[in-house]
């Protein structure tokens, strides 16, 4: 298993190549590069920010800047670069230290190597006043067709690389079979020394340092030192999740996952982001530009990654499968997020109450409980919500078109479940019966609420007067007695009510609606309780005067109680 680097998925363009790309192709390239980088970072890979990404974040063109490199560019290396034409290209920049890539396309050497072509990539690091001097080179990725006579080939199987260092660092040298070895403490390998190889003639064509599966071999001790530096251990560890990184800057960027820090703010809408590249991608949404169009349905997107994700809905392809439960996903990020369910890994912890969550979105949603933030506001009534899903559910109330209409009373509802629940009023079907008193209900929820009257379980207590209730809704309704709140207003006469049901009954005075009809005589009533009392006449029952008096007294006492509280709170 080898580690994927950004260079494995990156594409470089010269100025000449970049000129031939149109705007759509350039936008496609930019989105792909940013998406590839974000995918690598999300997998926890400790990679420096590529220079091409830094250019994209600054809104600059990502094509390579080419310069001709002559033998006078670096005086210290004049003799080593004779008879060569090298081109220098700026490439990836480390966050802590700038880097350059020297890409040698064609080497024009003496007649012995005139037909030898290969690609060499070296990275030169420099600082401050040493900017114009060669400090050291790092072999990155090297390919060749054939090795000329006298060239030493250096192989590191652990990192899947072949190192060609001939005539760039030193004259041709020969490694003694009896030489001492340099040992790499990182890879725990023995490496041949260069103490006895200077100024020796080459007599066997080329030297290939053969190695076993994990050997890293070098002909010079300074090459070993460089190798160890470039492949040092990851010493920066996250205290929250234990993930390790090779650089402090990468750890700092990773830390934002736990802290929720988002230092990059959009000046258009105020939305914040944890990475500059995410802000750049977001700002495209304000321009309204959507150059990426789905050929199946015609839907357009501002980012190529969004188009790619959308296209999976047409194909139904889900190549990423969970090995634990077999569930498949169309995106690898969804699979990674899903795997936390099996591991019960909760990386995101609330710093206020200590509650932990599997998903970062769940933590953000939870934190709004502490802050009281309600950013989603209904344009119809101004009511605010902490979640967009809550706002969507609320907006159904204001929907002009309501799909579900009762064929009995023509009342409309926003969902089928509400319509079915309402229709039980007209059918008077009450299949749910209380085993204690025999009372029947048309909904199981109503029966469950009724059963609390028998058990006398009242878990909801008023914090002001101490009165307890069996239902949470009853507590909310009672609490309005203390606050005097009457949010439900009749649009006909302006009268206000503390309960929506009271407003509904009141509005029937204006509309003349009487939905409760007696099956015996056809008489209709505006209240269900009036119909129940009327039906006793047909059954030969005579309502007890005691019960009527108790009901009247109870209603009166409730009104007196409400008025007394209103005076206390006034």
Curated annotation (Swiss-Prot):
Residues 4-75 form the KRAB domain. SMART domains: KRAB, ZnF_C2H2. GO terms for cellular component: nucleus. There is a cross-link at residue 125 (Glycyl lysine isopeptide (Lys-Gly) (interchain with G-Cter in SUMO2)). InterPro entries: C2H2-ZF_domain, KRAB, KRAB_dom_sf, Znf_C2H2_sf, Znf_C2H2_type. Pfam families: KRAB, zf-C2H2. GO terms for biological process: regulation of transcription by RNA polymerase II. One of its GO terms (molecular function) is DNA-binding transcription factor activity, RNA polymerase II-specific. Keywords: DNA-binding, Isopeptide bond, Metal-binding, Nucleus, Repeat, Transcription, Transcription regulation, Ubl conjugation, Zinc, Zinc-finger. Gene3D superfamilies: 6.10.140.140, Classic Zinc Finger. A zinc finger (C2H2-type) spans 236-258, 264-286, 292-314, 320-342, 348-370, 376-398, 404-426, 432-454, 460-482, 488-510, 516-538. It is found in: Nucleus. Its main location: nucleus. Belongs to the krueppel C2H2-type zinc-finger protein family. May be involved in transcriptional regulation. This is Zinc finger protein 181.
């Amino acid at each position: 298993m080898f580690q994927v680097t950004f260079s494995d998925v990156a594409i470089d363009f010269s100025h000449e190549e970049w000129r031939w790309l149109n705007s759509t192709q350039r936008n496609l390239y930019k989105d792909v590069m940013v998406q590839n980088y974000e995918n690598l970072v999300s997998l926890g890979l400790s990679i420096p920010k590529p220079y091409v990404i830094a250019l994209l974040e600054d809104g600059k063109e990502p094509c390579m800047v080419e310069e001709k490199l002559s033998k006078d560019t670096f005086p210290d290396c004049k003799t080593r670069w004779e008879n060569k034409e090298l081109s220098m290209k700026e490439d990836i920049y480390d966050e802590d230290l700038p880097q350059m890539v020297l890409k040698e396309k064609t080497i024009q050497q003496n007649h012995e190597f005139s037909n030898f072509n290969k690609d060499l990539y070296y990275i030169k690091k420099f600082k401050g006043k040493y900017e114009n001097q060669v400090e050291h080179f790092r072999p990155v990725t090297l390919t060749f067709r054939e090795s000329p006579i006298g060239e030493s080939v250096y192989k590191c199987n652990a990192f899947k690389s072949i190192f060609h260092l001939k005539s760039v660092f030193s004259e041709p040298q020969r490694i003694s079979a009896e030489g001492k070895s340099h040992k790499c403490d990182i890879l725990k390998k023995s490496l041949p020394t260069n103490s006895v190889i200077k100024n020796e003639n080459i007599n066997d064509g080329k030297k290939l340092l053969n190695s076993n599966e994990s050997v890293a071999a070098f002909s010079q001790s300074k090459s070993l030192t460089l190798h160890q530096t470039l492949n040092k251990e990851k010493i920066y560890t996250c205290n929250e999740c234990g993930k390790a990184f090779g650089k402090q800057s990468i750890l700092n960027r990773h830390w934002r996952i736990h802290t929720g820090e988002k230092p990059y703010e959009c000046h258009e809408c105020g939305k914040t982001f944890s990475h500059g590249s995410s802000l750049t991608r977001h700002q495209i949404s304000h321009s309204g530009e959507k150059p990426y169009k789905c050929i199946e349905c015609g839907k357009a997107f501002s980012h190529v990654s969004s188009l790619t994700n959308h296209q999976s809905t047409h194909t139904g392809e889900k190549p990423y499968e969970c090995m634990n439960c077999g569930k498949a996903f169309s995106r690898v990020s969804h699979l990674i997020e899903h795997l936390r369910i099996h591991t019960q890994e909760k990386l995101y912890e609330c710093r206020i109450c200590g509650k932990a969550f599997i998903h970062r979105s769940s933590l953000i949603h939870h934190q709004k409980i502490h802050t009281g933030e309600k950013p989603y506001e209904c344009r119809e009534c101004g009511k605010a919500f902490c979640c967009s899903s809550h706002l969507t559910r609320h907006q159904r109330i204001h929907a002009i078109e309501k799909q579900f209409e009762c064929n009995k009373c023509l009342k409309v509802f926003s969902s089928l479940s509400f319509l079915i629940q309402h229709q039980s009023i007209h059918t008077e079907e009450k299949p749910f019966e209380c085993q204690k008193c025999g009372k029947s209900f048309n909904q199981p929820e109503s029966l469950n609420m009724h059963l609390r009257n028998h058990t006398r379980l009242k878990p909801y207590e008023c914090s002001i007067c101490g009165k307890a209730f069996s239902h949470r809704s009853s507590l909310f309704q009672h609490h309005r007695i203390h606050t005097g709140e009457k949010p439900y207003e009749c649009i006909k006469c302006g009268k206000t009510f503390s309960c929506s049901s009271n407003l509904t009954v009141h509005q029937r005075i204006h509309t003349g609606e009487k939905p409760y009809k007696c099956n015996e005589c056809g008489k209709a009533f505006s209240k269900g309780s009036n119909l129940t009392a009327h039906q006793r006449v047909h059954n030969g029952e005579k309502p007890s005067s005691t019960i009527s008096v108790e009901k009247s007294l109870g209603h009166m006492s409730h009104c007196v109680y409400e008025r007394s509280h209103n005076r206390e709170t006034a």
